[in-house]
Amino acid sequence: PIAGSMVLAAILLKLGGYGIIRMMQILPATKTDMFLPFIVLALWGAILANLTCLQQTDLKSLIAYSSISHMGLVVAAIIIQTPWGLSGAMALMIAHGFTSSALFCLANTTYERTHTRILILTRGFHNILPMTTTWWLFVNLMNIAIPPTMNFTSELLIMSTLFNWCPTTIIMLGLSMLITASYSLHMFLSTQMGPTPLNNQTEPTHSREHLLMALHVIPLMMISMKPELIT
């Protein structure tokens, strides 16, 4: 069910990050070296999840693995226990909560019209549903973390935190972000561009679907422009 996927990606997945934040408060803040294996594991897990996204043919699985890769960055930032790291981790959890939920919503919009989640069978929607293609572009750009979105701010804080802690981590972070951009663009091009393989008539989009997307994108942009709204 699409509602379950949206709640799982937007809220339940972030509860683990919140639990780690609460647990780290009772641990000594100066002993980050003892957590080195966990930080490396989190970053390596993010890269592996990103690589898994690149080879996915199922649209819903691709979005699910995307959420896992972003949580790897969140865990690494939390474990370092710096103010910038915690701020970046919380901001990324909020930003990616909106983004992943919107992606699942768009995937369901496509599925209701094609009755398949295979990427190659869902292409060609830019001619049939241009407004939906616009939403796909907006949300994928947020997933890539372009400025001035909250995703960009949070990833910049996490990158600064990890680089100050150990400059070598910039290699893993850079690789992770490069692959994130690759699969996000691949997802957009695969689902929207090219000739449509369907010969049957496609149902137009409904106002409720555009309203649902607006309720994801507009709050995220408002928080990006004015973070004081949630502080």
Curated annotation (Swiss-Prot):
GO cellular component: mitochondrial membrane
Pfam families, A to Z: Proton_antipo_M
Membrane topology note: Multi-pass membrane protein
Compartments it resides in: Mitochondrion membrane
Any one GO molecular function term: NADH dehydrogenase (ubiquinone) activity
Spans traversing the lipid bilayer: 1-21, 34-54, 63-85, 89-111, 128-148, 169-189
One of the GO biological process terms: electron transport coupled proton transport
Class in the EC hierarchy, top level: translocase
InterPro entries: NADH_UbQ_OxRdtase (IPR003918), ND/Mrp_TM (IPR001750)
EC numbers, comma separated: 7.1.1.2
Annotated function: Core subunit of the mitochondrial membrane respiratory chain NADH dehydrogenase (Complex I) that is believed to belong to the minimal assembly required for catalysis. Complex I functions in the transfer of electrons from NADH to the respiratory chain. The immediate electron acceptor for the enzyme is believed to be ubiquinone.
Protein name: NADH-ubiquinone oxidoreductase chain 4
Organism: Deinagkistrodon acutus (Hundred-pace snake)
Gene expressing this chain: MT-ND4
